[in-house]
Structures are given as C-alpha cells and as structure tokens.
C-alpha cells in the first residue's frame, strides 16, 4: 500500500492522518523531497544551506521606512508637475514646471526662448542643447551656422496659405494641412514646446491652420495660430490655439478667439472650443463669452431666448447658459416654476465697456476675405442644388433612353 489512512479521536474531534509509504515507487517526488530536507545541501546539492538561505531578503523596519520616504518624495514631485495648468488658451505668461528635455534654449529670430515642455523632434535635434528655427518657414536646425546658411536661401516671407484677413500690419493666413503638411507639422512641433496637452504633431491633413502674423516691413512674423477640423462632428471651431510666449500679454489670444467665432458666424453655425479647456483657457474663454453675451443682450430687440442669444453670438447653447449664470441674470422663479432672465442694463454695459478697455485689439469683420471650406461631398451637393449636375439615377435613365433611341 502506498498510503495508509488512520483515524484518531480526541476530545470529540476526529483527526484524519494520511501516512505515505516513502519506499513506494508510485511517489518518487515525495521521497526526493524528504532526501532534500534531510541532506546538508539544497537544490539537489547545487547550493549549500548558506547560499540558499533567504532570511536576509525579508523586509525589516528600515526597509519599510525607506520605501515610504521614497514614495512620499515621488508623489510630491508628481503633484507639483500636474499642478501647473496648460497655457494653451491664455494670453498671460505663466512659468511652467521644469521638464526632462535636452533642449535648453530655442532660438527663434532674435529671441532666445526657454522651452516649457518636450516636443517630439527627431532624435538628432531633440538631443541638442539648442534648437534653431527659421521664422519664415519654421524649419528646425541644430546649429546657428546651418541656420545662417538656410536664411541665405530661404525665400519665404509669409505662411504658405491664403491671406484671408489684413488690418494694417496684422494678417491671418489660412493654411491647409493637406497641401502644406511640412509647414503645419513644423508649426505643431513648435507649439508642443509650449503646450502640455497637445497630442497632434504629424497627422495634419484633416485640419486647417489659421496663422496670425505681424508685418515688420520685410516679412510676416508668426505670432500665434489656431487650428480647426475641416469636418467636425462636434461643432468645434477650435482644436488647438497658441500665442507664442514672446507675443503674450498683448491681447493676441483673445483676438484669435474672436476671429474663430467670426469664421463660425460666416459659416452660419454654432461653435465651441474643443474640451476640456485648461484653467487659464477657461478663464479667457469665459471672459470673452461674458462680453459677447452682454453685447447680445444689449442689442437684441426681439423676444430674448437662449436660441436667439446663441444665434447672435455663434455660441452653442451650453456655453450661453453657463455665461448667463456667471452674469447672474439666469435665475429660477419659484412662483412661475421656470427659469427667467433678470437683466440689469447698467451692469451689462459695465461688463462690455470694461472688456473693450482691456482688449482694444478687435477683429473687423469687414476686412475678412474668406469662404467656408467645402469638401468633395459638399461641392457635389451644392452643384446638385444649383441644377448644374444631374443626379446619378436620372443620368442612367437618360443614358438608357438615348441608347434605345439609337437602336
């Protein structure tokens, strides 16, 4: 018998004992285990007991204390890194946290700028201490000598797109990401150095880029830009927006926001920036929304409604409602059991005047020379609407009738 089952009764409890026959050939593993335990060596003689001793690997109080200390330091460092908001929509300069990047300085024209974040430039450029970028074509180089030689041959004096707006020395160019992918990719890589949340670098074909420039007498200098999808399923009128740090705190960020809503108004749509917004971006947009809604409430002569305000401002209804609440004019009437607008004209005028004093740089709609982007499907629908094209089923019917007549 390889094993014997014994029963032992003690204090009303039955103990089941299984006794193995170590000499049985049916349980060789058990015999090997007993030999290993009784021998002076372990692991079948490969290691001595001293070498196989694992007692020194057990955690003690010092190990636990050091681990907790290191964990606390790591958590504190992570919290500091995430406590800074993304400056993607703000016109105010904010000192960013230090980032693990090899590029110490960015040379852009006559300016030396310290990058805020890491940008995925090719390795030979991202490992360099300094990065040099041409102000005209945004080509990046890793030495000043290469930049100077490039300037001798670079013939660009403005972005490679259509100039759709000009007011004195301020211009805005519309650049198609599909037609000018290299320029748009360079623009995105430059923007990533100052935008923490930007994830788009190379897939630029589905986007249109609106580049804000300032003419200095010789060429148009890039100030900032915003991008938008050619076909947005969520009615976003801004995907990404940036004012370069050297041009911040001059009102250009609000200028770009105002221009994006002007394009939305020309399209006959309602628009909103892509969510989520950064802290500073939300503050900037809310300030702009207050001005737009206050102006609309002062000018609307027809019965006021959420849809009427949205149509007047080109803002989506959700943004209009949140702005009305921030203006303290959207309140609930417990007697009528519905929401009502309680307008105070003097307060609305103060909001509008204060915003105009702080932001004198405004977009002039009369200077816009632009038509909305039309895709192939939209062009076909437009031509069909104008009876220029014949619908496909009707065209086949005409072709068949012509064939029968010829027979």
UniProtKB/Swiss-Prot annotation:
Zinc finger C2HC MYST-type: from-to: 131-156
GO MF, any single term: histone acetyltransferase activity
Transmembrane annotation, as ranges: none
Enzyme class (EC, first level): transferase
UniProt keyword list: Acetylation, Chromatin regulator, Cytoplasm, DNA damage, Metal-binding, Nucleus, Transferase, Zinc, Zinc-finger
Residue(s) carrying N6-acetyllysine: 198
Cellular component terms per the entry's GO annotation: chromatin; cytosol; Mst2 histone acetyltransferase complex; NuA3a histone acetyltransferase complex; nucleus
Modified how: Autoacetylation at Lys-198 is required for proper function.
Binding site for acetyl-CoA: 241-243, 248-254, 278, 287
PANTHER family in UniProt: HISTONE ACETYLTRANSFERASE (PTHR10615), HISTONE ACETYLTRANSFERASE KAT7 (PTHR10615:SF161)
Assembly mode: Component of the mst2 complex composed of at least eaf6, mst2, nto1, pdp3, ptf1, ptf2 and tfg3.
UniProt similarity note: Belongs to the MYST (SAS/MOZ) family.
Name of the protein: Histone acetyltransferase mst2
Species the sequence originates in: Schizosaccharomyces pombe (strain 972 / ATCC 24843)
């Amino acid at each position: 018998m390889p094993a014997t089952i014994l029963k032992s009764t003690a204090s009303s409890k039955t103990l089941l004992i299984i006794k193995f026959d170590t000499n049985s050939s049916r349980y060789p593993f058990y015999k090997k285990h007993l030999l290993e335990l009784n021998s002076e060596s372990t692991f079948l003689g490969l290691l001595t007991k001293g070498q196989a001793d694992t007692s020194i690997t057990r955690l003690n109080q010092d190990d636990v204390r050091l681990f907790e200390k290191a964990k606390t330091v790591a958590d504190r460092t992570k919290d500091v890194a995430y406590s800074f908001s993304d400056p993607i929509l703000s016109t105010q300069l904010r000192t960013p946290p230090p980032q693990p990047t090899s590029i110490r300085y960015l040379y852009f024209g006559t300016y030396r700028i310290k990058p805020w974040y890491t940008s995925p430039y090719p390795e030979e450029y991202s490992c360099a201490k300094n990065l040099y970028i041409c102000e005209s074509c945004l080509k990046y180089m890793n030495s000043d000598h290469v930049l100077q030689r490039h300037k001798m041959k670079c013939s660009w004096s403005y972005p490679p797109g259509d100039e759709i707006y000009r007011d004195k020395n301020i211009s805005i160019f519309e650049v198609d990401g599909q037609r000018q992918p290299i320029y748009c990719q360079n623009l995105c890589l430059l923007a990533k150095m100052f935008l923490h949340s930007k994830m788009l670098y190379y897939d630029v074909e589905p986007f249109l880029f609106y580049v804000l420039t300032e003419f200095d007498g010789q060429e148009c200098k890039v100030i900032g830009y915003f991008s938008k999808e050619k076909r947005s399923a969520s009615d976003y009128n801004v995907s990404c927006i940036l004012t370069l740090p050297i041009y911040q705190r001059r009102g250009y960020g609000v200028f770009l926001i105002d221009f994006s809503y002007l394009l939305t108004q020309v399209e006959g749509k309602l628009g909103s920036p892509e969510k989520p917004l950064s802290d500073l971006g939300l503050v900037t947009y809310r300030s702009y929304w207050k001005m737009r809604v206050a102006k609309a409430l002062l000018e609307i002569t027809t019965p006021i409604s959420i849809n009427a305000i949205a149509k007047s401002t080109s803002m989506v209804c959700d943004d209009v409602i949140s702005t009305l609440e921030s203006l303290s004019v959207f309140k609930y009437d417990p007697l009528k059991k519905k929401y009502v607008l309680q307008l105070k004209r003097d307060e609305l005028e103060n909001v509008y005047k204060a915003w105009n004093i702080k932001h004198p740089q405004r977009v002039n709609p009369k200077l816009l020379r632009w038509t909305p982007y039309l895709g192939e499907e939209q062009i076909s629908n437009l031509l069909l609407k104008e009876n220029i094209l014949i619908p496909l089923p009707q065209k086949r019917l005409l072709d068949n009738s012509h064939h029968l007549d010829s027979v």
